[in-house]
Amino acid sequence: MAPEDDDLDDELEDDEDYDDDDERAAPQTEVTIEVTGLSLYTHHGVSAAEREVGQRLVLDLRLEVGECDATVTDLVEDTVDYAAVCERVALVAQQRSYKTLERLCSAIADRLLADFAAEEVWVKATKPEPPIPLPVESVSVEVWRQSSGE
């Protein structure tokens, strides 16, 4: 066993002696949660055909959580659960049709701020194959919002 391994074993043993009261007294850390490439089939677009037939939409999200107890407690209930965030975003994106990505991103941002403990949210929606008559790889819209602090 290498000497570094002995040091690591000692550190791990020391961690086992660390109790919950010590953890709660430790300084908190600012946390940002990012979700990249959430791919959903949706019905958004200016044309009736886009809204009827639908298309793949890719969403990227960033939530500024601020101080987060989970950095110390290691408990998912002490942070924003990114699986729940993805489920909520999918619900907003798929429950109705919007003509513009701007409105869709705004609706998602509003829902995230209302439902999760985030100080700021950033939402980017990308259409990988936009229905325009020019060679374009993708189009996207970004919306950034801050919590009202209530």
Can you describe what each PLM-predicted range is?
Residues 1-150:
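N-terminal, polar/charged subdomain of small-to-medium soluble alpha/beta proteins
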